[in-house]
Amino acid sequence: MGVSGSKGQKLFVSVLQRLLSERGLHVKESSAIEFYQFLIKVSPWFPEEGGLNLQDWKRVGREMKKYAAEHGTDSIPKQAYPIWLQLREILTEQSDLVLLSAEAKSVTEEELEEGLTGLLSASSQEKTYGTRGTAYAEIDTEVDKLSEHIYDEPYEEKEKADKNEEKDHVRKVKKIVQRKENSEHKRKEKDQKAFLATDWNNDDLSPEDWDDLEEQAAHYHDDDELILPVKRKVDKKKPLALRRKPLPPVGFAGAMAEAREKGDLTFTFPVVFMGESDDDDTPVWEPLPLKTLKELQSAVRTMGPSAPYTLQVVDMVASQWLTPSDWHQTARATLSPGDYVLWRTEYEEKSKETVQKTAGKRKGKVSLDMLLGTGQFLSPSSQIKLSKDVLKDVTTNAVLAWRAIPPPGVKKTVLAGLKQGNEESYETFISRLEEAVYRMMPRGEGSDILIKQLAWENANSLCQDLIRPMRKTGTMQDYIRACLDASPAVVQGMAYAAAMRGQKYSTFVKQTYGGGKGGQGSEGPVCFSCGKTGHIKRDCKEEKGSKRAPPGLCPRCKKGYHWKSECKSKFDKDGNPLPPLETNAENSKNLVKGQSPSPTQKGDKGKDSGLNPEAPPFTIHDLPRGTPGSAGLDLSSQKDLILSLEDGVSLVPTLVKGTLPEGTTGLIIGRSSNYKKGLEVLPGVIDSDFQGEIKVMVKAAKNAVIIHKGERIAQLLLLPYLKLPNPIIKEERGSEGFGSTSHVHWVQEISDSRPMLHISLNGRRFLGLLDTGADKTCIAGRDWPANWPIHQTESSLQGLGMACGVARSSQPLRWQHEDKSGIIHPFVIPTLPFTLWGRDIMKEIKVRLMTDSPDDSQDLMIGAIESNLFADQISWKSDQPVWLNQWPLKQEKLQALQQLVTEQLQLGHLEESNSPWNTPVFVIKKKSGKWRLLQDLRAVNATMHDMGALQPGLPSPVAVPKGWEIIIIDLQDCFFNIKLHPEDCKRFAFSVPSPNFKRPYQRFQWKVLPQGMKNSPTLCQKFVDKAILTVRDKYQDSYIVHYMDDILLAHPSRSIVDEILTSMIQALNKHGLVVSTEKIQKYDNLKYLGTHIQGDAVSYQKLQIRTDKLRTLNDFQKLLGNINWIRPFLKLTTGELKPLFEILNGDSNPISIRKLTPEACKALQLVNERLSIARVKRLDLSRPWSLCILKTEYTPTACLWQNGVLEWIHLPHISPKVITPYDIFCTQLIIKGRHRSKELFSKDPDYIVVPYTKVQFDLLLQEKEDWPISLLGFLGEVHFHLPKDPLLTFTLQTAIIFPHMTSTTPLEKGIVIFTDGSANGRSVTYIQGREPIIKENTQNTAQQAEIVAVITAFEEVSQSFNLYTDSKYVTGLFPEIETATLSPRTKIYTELRHLQRLIHKRQEKFYIGHIRGHTGLPGPLAQGNAYADSLTRILTALESAQESHALHHQNAAALRFQFHITREQAREIVKLCPNCPDWGHAPQLGVNPRGLKPRVLWQMDVTHVSEFGKLKYVHVTVDTYSHFTFATARTGEATKDVLQHLAQSFAYMGFPQKIKTDNAPAYVSRSIQEFLARWKISHVTGIPYNPQGQAIVERTHQNIKAQLNKLQKAGKYYTPHHLLAHALFVLNHVNMDNQGHTAAERHWGPISADPKPMVMWKDLLAGSWKGPDVLITAGRGYACVFPQDAETPIWVPDRFIRPFTERKEATPTPGTAEKTPPRDEKDQQKSPEDESSPHQREDGLATSAGVNLRSGGGS
């Protein structure tokens, strides 16, 4: 249902009564409420997660049955079963419809009509769909399975029954109809009476009911039984149906139609207004098309709720008038439970916002109940009466809520922010976590894993310490059990306990809280006898099996038989007193820190240390050595100790006393094994004359560490002692102070007054007592801030008295005192009279105590607080000295240098130096006539690390609170009063030269901060800041500003600011800084950092812009830099300064000449005018302030405003983007203004005023991501009207700042225009109904061409138009370009500016749309774009040839004839191809008979192409006349492969008269011979093992392989067949001969009728020349002639033929013919191109194929 509480109850009761009343049944409201309350008790999940559907309702029934079994039937209300059964019958109707529909599909329409005539005519006006039963027994599992089966199996997916099944179904239907016809009337009456006459005090079924129930249940598994609808009572008062049909459709749509006829409008929507006008609209519910709902559900399931298509379907649904109930039903039916919860939440939030926004406009006519469908509008019948405005708001909110659903896979960071608070109990945190997780995902293994992971990750630090050991193995119950009493004391105590038991911390936690595989205590209890887990002491077998014998005579008293440890005697048997009995730590019950009940160490006591424990103290000579080769002597602890991280450094006694052996000194170092257990030993030096006890300084490196008595913890290394003649402070060290040589400190004597000290904790000052006896700092309860968290501890304060109820800070605090700071974790004691500073903080601030007594119990030396009056030490990149020789100086400058050095020596700023560093110095003369000393420190600056700027900007006096008194002081010679660190002085040495080298150079080095050192400003700022820190802490309510050597003091009271001045001067003098008393300014008319403070107004000091020296780029750059510096005080917009900024464009040379333009002169005059009136105000902290965005020309301007301007904020002149919309400039100003407000006042402005209307602002938030980002985290208000002040009225005269001419959707009556442009500079504008406009400019880029085309459209068409382009760049310009500022740096600035002006001149709107190019789709838009695109192409013939060759790799002749290029160009293309020249072959000259026309003689063979794998056997057939080739790749070369190849060849090439092959077995087989005989094809074979007879096909093999290699290198082919087909295509249809004919043309084209040439030829057999005869064909190496007296042609080598030229002389006789000389060398060396086909030579692949030189026939 999704609703709980009283609303859920009202909703359920209303729905229940309505459903039952529609069936003629009535139930009292009290009975319905009682049933609902019982329902919540049985099924608490139902109000929130359940719904009125069959699945949930049956789950309720099962839980009712389970509840009755556990609590008895008397615990169930009497009316529960009847109500549940009736409601289940209603919900089951849909199942019956599905079943009936499935059965009806197998029955013919005539048979179904005949079989159901009686049933349908019985009550034609009361047709409803019923249920299968009404008894409680139908809740059983079998019925559930049947119902689920019916729902899970859609009837559309059932197969149609065959004819026999159809007959069976007809028989079944007839049989059932007959049965139902007889009992229907009786069943109807019985069904109604059963509910109306129900005895509410008796829920037992009557015998008749049980019989009927058993009969119905028996039919559930009967194949012959078909459940038909049960007729129900219909309320006669319902209005008649609007439409009547003879037979309603079967299925869900039919059920809805039937329900509407009966007046049931629960599932009928949307609302349709039937009136003709708004006044007489009558709302009527109409059905939403079921197809639409199915489409929506399918889209959500397949593509997600936020997919574009899904949102389109939602918009289609939203086009109807839907009520809140309709939307909830639609969302619940189509969305997942998690998405539905998100949608419902968002819908409620949007509805609340709508009510708030429209409260004033509609005067409360729209309530939240209307929008949510709650309260009096809970029922659908009441929602139908809602007005159109309300329904529109409902639809708007529903769609917005739908769009807010995140896409699949996008996880919100809700769970990441759900963390346990410091004071929150762990179980409360887990409860919140489970609630959040279960809302996002259903319960199950996945949610449990997520909860467990987050229960660890998001827990606080204390709980994580307890969970960490069992994180992987523990359960959630283990986590909760461990964190029940989580506190720092518990964690520390467990660490102590683990250490005392010798266990790991993780093991101890697992034993205590569980976490193993077995849950809590999976390892079992721990035995106190043997220490093992799994049993207790009484069950210990080791104890029982190892009982020691009875004790003998006591060795202590010698008087009785008992153990020594149990001896209680005070005197021995002789009466002598006995020493006290030593008590082991194990038996001690009063354990304190430092006494650990540790288990016994390996060996006896003292054995591990090697010392005799009965004879302390020890000397150095008693210490043991680990091995003969050990370098150190072992030091052991002589007491049990437990250390924690908070204890810091502790001293461990060793009972070993000095002195060391003569001539040695000692070095104490730790043992490596100690580091493994977390014990860190601090190294120490033992002086040779030290006589006291040697102690070891240790500290814990992890939670807790235990040190057992006798355990070796350190080594003492004895080293040779070299005594030097250094000064001696004391004669002998003796036993005083453990450590090395003493220090010299300032001494403060102890007086009667308490030693109190101020220390800051987290920025808050505390006054406390220095207590050397306090281990830890303790804060008095009265001093502790109430809002600082603390937690109680189990420890108590022990001293002279005891303090209980000790608390401790829940978080570490940062302390600070002067220049020292650190972290402490103090205790908080309510009863302390004042705060105690313990040793944990005194040792950090260097507090020491000096005493002459050698018997101090504390080995400490405590003295006064150290001071440091040096600047911080500089960090250097290298220690390599830098030496630059001093250059010579003139006499005047040399004398000035010597005088200045003398003065600085007297002032203590310089000292003599022997430094290896040296850099030059020089002097300059100031205007006053005085000289100034400077040092060239560039080389030194390069060797130091940059310390950075501590104050990146100037402080503004605007932030000084309004009305406060102000004093400004200035420090005199600040750099020279700050001392350099002694280690750095040597690096700033210099030399004073001597003329003519009369004396050695005098060398000096600076002791103070030198001018020219890059880190001097930073060091100065840090030093002064430390000096005034005490004044800041003392006067925290004052306002103190420090920048370099200027300090501003402010306070509301004049007397207090004077007091601050006195304290400030004292603090500065204490650090050696001097205040210039003559420069102290007080109260009013003050000058500070270039500004003038007069009252509450701040102005810039008077300036005058000079124009007489503005000549170069550098001059103008400085001028504009100064103007920008003072612009925060000036009302100067960027548009007003634009003429000045434009002067900077052009040559980047700094000395390039620039001139003032008239516009720039006006801008400078405006600057001077604004300087004279520039004023800003100081801030009033008690009032809010605003950030106002002002709409000014070119770019917007902003100001911080509080009844006046606090500061002006401007944007740069040039934007980094080419096109920046005006609204984006506004977001940049918002970000910059908020940042500036936080810089000045540490707070966001209270209001932001934007130059847009509310509607425009909302649209910008939705459409532009920059706006939400600019307002991220802003908690104030956004306003849309500027303050009414004359200062801001200039912004009212402004240009367009919001696009209004660009339409976001296509215009209905707009002219259609297509534009395109290409990189060749051609732009095309195709206006529908006109001739295309083509413009060419070879200088244009593709972007420029695209923009030119768009500009042409704007120039040609003034009406509304829809422009389409395939350029993303062009569509991206709109609508921003309408209000954008254009950057002049772009090359297309002129075109963009022209386009912008055309837009501003337009009177009609336009639309710019993007369309994908080269899609080949049908339709006018795609075709129009394709047409425009085709007009932009200008491909040269050479480019086309290159593209074609890159694809096909054809020969040069084909390129020449196809693209009409020269022979040289074609050859050059082939030559430059990286794949073609590699495959040239030299032809073999010879004669090979071939056909004289196509399809006469073929040659066939098989070649192997290994790259084809299993298809490597390539069968090749070539026509010897046309050279037309066909090949197939096959898996073998057997007879079947040859037959299949021949069949395909015939289909591809026709069939020949003769085929020539070699003597391969497949070719000479009987099958081949029979096959060729049937086709009447002659078959001949060549000479065995002589391939020359097959020369043509062999050459074809090479051609095919060469073409395959070319294509394979140039492209990607998926199969061998694909590659082979492309190669055949090139050889047959692309390559050409010298006459421009392809092989296909020669093979299929007509044979030329041109006359054959006559030649003379030599008969090789007769050795004589004959002729003239007809030359049939000729080629490289061969010729075919047809003698006039012969019957067949004769083939001869081509060198034995001569062209016949008809002469007057007679034909030469044979004798003379023999003497005819052979062709000259020139003929013999003719180019192959002159004799062979181009497709065989020009690409380097010459073959033996020839060309019919005259007729164009084959070769």
Swiss-Prot record:
Residues 1490-1647 form the Integrase catalytic domain. Keywords: Aspartyl protease, Capsid protein, DNA integration, DNA recombination, DNA-binding, DNA-directed DNA polymerase, Endonuclease, Hydrolase, Lipoprotein, Magnesium, Metal-binding, Multifunctional enzyme, Myristate, Nuclease, Nucleotide-binding, Nucleotidyltransferase, Phosphoprotein, Protease, Repeat, RNA-binding, RNA-directed DNA polymerase, Transferase, Viral genome integration, Viral matrix protein, Viral nucleoprotein, Virion, Virus entry into host cell, Zinc, Zinc-finger. GO terms for biological process: DNA integration; DNA recombination; establishment of integrated proviral latency; proteolysis; symbiont entry into host cell; viral genome integration into host DNA; viral translational frameshifting. Its cofactor is Mg(2+). Pfam families: dUTPase, Gag_p10, Gag_p24, Gag_p24_C, IN_DBD_C, Integrase_Zn, RNase_H, rve. Residues 905-1093 form the Reverse transcriptase domain. A zinc finger (Integrase-type) spans 1436-1477. The active site is at D771 (protease). Residues 766-841 form the Peptidase A2 domain. It catalyses: DNA(n) + a 2'-deoxyribonucleoside 5'-triphosphate = DNA(n+1) + diphosphate; Endonucleolytic cleavage to 5'-phosphomonoester; dUTP + H2O = dUMP + diphosphate + H(+). A motif (PTAP/PSAP motif) lies at residues 305-308. Residues 1653-1702 bind DNA. Signal peptide: none annotated. Mg(2+) 2 binds at D1316, E1346, D1366, D1429. A lipid is attached at G2 (N-myristoyl glycine). Residues 1307-1437 form the RNase H type-1 domain. The record marks 99-100, 195-196, 228-229, 254-255, 269-270, 496-497, 745-746, 1437-1438 as: Cleavage. Residues 154-193, 572-631, 1699-1755 are annotated as: Disordered. One of its GO terms (cellular component) is viral nucleocapsid. Mg(2+) 1 binds at D970, D1045, D1046. A zinc finger (CCHC-type) spans 525-542, 552-569. Mg(2+) 3 binds at D1501, D1558, E1594. PANTHER family: ENDOGENOUS RETROVIRUS GROUP K MEMBER POL PROTEIN, RNA-DIRECTED DNA POLYMERASE-RELATED. This is Gag-Pro-Pol polyprotein. It comes from Mouse mammary tumor virus (strain C3H) (MMTV).
